[in-house]
From Swiss-Prot:
Its main location: secreted. Belongs to the short scorpion toxin superfamily. Potassium channel inhibitor family. Alpha-KTx 03 subfamily. Gene3D superfamilies: Knottin, scorpion toxin-like. This is Potassium channel toxin alpha-KTx 3.15. Expressed by the venom gland. Has the structural arrangement of an alpha-helix connected to antiparallel beta-sheets by disulfide bonds (CS-alpha/beta). Negative results: has no effect on rat Kv1.2/KCNA2, Kv1.4/KCNA4 and Kv1.5/KCNA5 channels.
Length: 29
């Protein structure tokens, strides 16, 4: 399986997506 990616707006792709990036895989703007 591939790591999950969390779609986020550039304004919201800060702490929530940083945590998701460490825990689940990645965050894409």
């Amino acid at each position: 399986g591939s790591p999950l990616t969390y779609p986020c707006h550039s304004a919201q792709c800060e702490q929530p997506c940083k945590d998701a990036n460490m825990r689940f895989g990645x965050c894409m703007n």
